[in-house]
């Protein structure tokens, strides 16, 4: 289930032609270029799905503010009612322990989701990716392959297959003078991709990388089948990587220490 998908064409219509100023610092392929477009998406969703739409840190602040008598990280963690969502959305023990009205969470670049949509105990985690289509560039980091493996394991252990989606919106832009101009968008659902085709870049902090517009959406199995298929893919890739690392970095030097 996606709250975004039914209104995606509206989002697409609003975004195409939108201009944001070229960042004064940072690279055009980095966070500085993407953040203004992400803010436009958030603004649209906040205006049209106001009761559902949060930044991840806003949701956590709201969750804890509704239960001010609950203190301590262990008690606050129980508010999630889901080990998988706790893993995906929560902050660390110290930060959760020290949270207060005077010490609210702030946005972190490594939050799992740029935008979180919540309704009837279902969560849609949305990440906004941007792409300079004037240049051929490596696909962006999407999510840690290890973090996704841990997520799949928790889904299976706790039989939590219908609580959340992880989806992506790509904003394609071109540089026009001092402006970045949106020329197209794409939307894709992680759990509709073929797990065995996800590219893991082990040299880039084990990140799964893809362009949203290129992500296959042909998987027709259950969420449990997706999780198990991904774990098989991850383990196979990890085993191959381990063999490669030993062959390259261990075997040539072992004779010197034996």
UniProtKB/Swiss-Prot annotation:
The keyword Ion transport does not apply. It comes from the Bacteria. Keywords: Endonuclease, Hydrolase, Nuclease, Restriction system. Its EC number is 3.1.21.4. The keyword S-adenosyl-L-methionine does not apply. One of its GO terms (molecular function) is DNA binding. Pfam families: Endonuc-HincII. GO terms for biological process: DNA restriction-modification system. Gene3D superfamilies: DNA mismatch repair MutH/Restriction endonuclease, type II. SUPFAM superfamilies: Restriction endonuclease-like. It catalyses: Endonucleolytic cleavage of DNA to give specific double-stranded fragments with terminal 5'-phosphates. It is an enzyme of class 3 (hydrolase). This is Type II restriction enzyme HindII. The gene is hindIIR.
């Amino acid at each position: 289930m996606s709250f975004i998908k039914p209104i995606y064409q509206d989002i697409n219509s609003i975004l195409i032609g939108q201009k944001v100023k070229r960042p004064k610092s940072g690279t055009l392929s980095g966070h500085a270029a993407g953040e203004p477009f992400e803010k436009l998406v958030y603004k649209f969703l906040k205006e049209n799905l106001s009761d559902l739409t949060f930044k991840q840190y806003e949701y956590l602040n709201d969750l804890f503010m509704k239960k001010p008598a609950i203190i301590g990280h262990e008690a606050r963690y129980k508010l999630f009612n889901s080990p998988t969502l706790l893993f995906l959305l929560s902050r660390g023990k110290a930060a959760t322990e020290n949270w207060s009205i005077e010490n609210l969470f702030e946005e972190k670049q490594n939050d799992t989701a740029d935008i979180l949509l919540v309704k009837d105990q279902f969560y849609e985690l949305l990440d906004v990716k941007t792409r300079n289509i004037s240049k051929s560039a490596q696909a962006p980091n999407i999510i840690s392959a290890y973090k996704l493996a841990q997520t799949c394991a928790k889904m299976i252990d706790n039989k939590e297959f219908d609580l959340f989606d992880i989806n992506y919106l790509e904003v394609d832009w071109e540089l026009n003078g001092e402006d970045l101009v949106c020329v197209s968008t794409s939307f894709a659902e992680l759990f509709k991709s073929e797990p065995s085709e996800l590219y893991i870049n082990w040299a880039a902090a084990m990140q799964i990388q893809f362009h949203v517009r290129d992500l296959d959406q042909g998987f027709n199995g259950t969420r449990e089948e997706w999780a198990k298929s991904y774990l098989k893919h991850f383990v196979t890739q990890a085993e191959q990587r381990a063999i490669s690392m030993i062959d390259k970095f261990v075997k040539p030097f072992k004779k010197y220490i034996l």
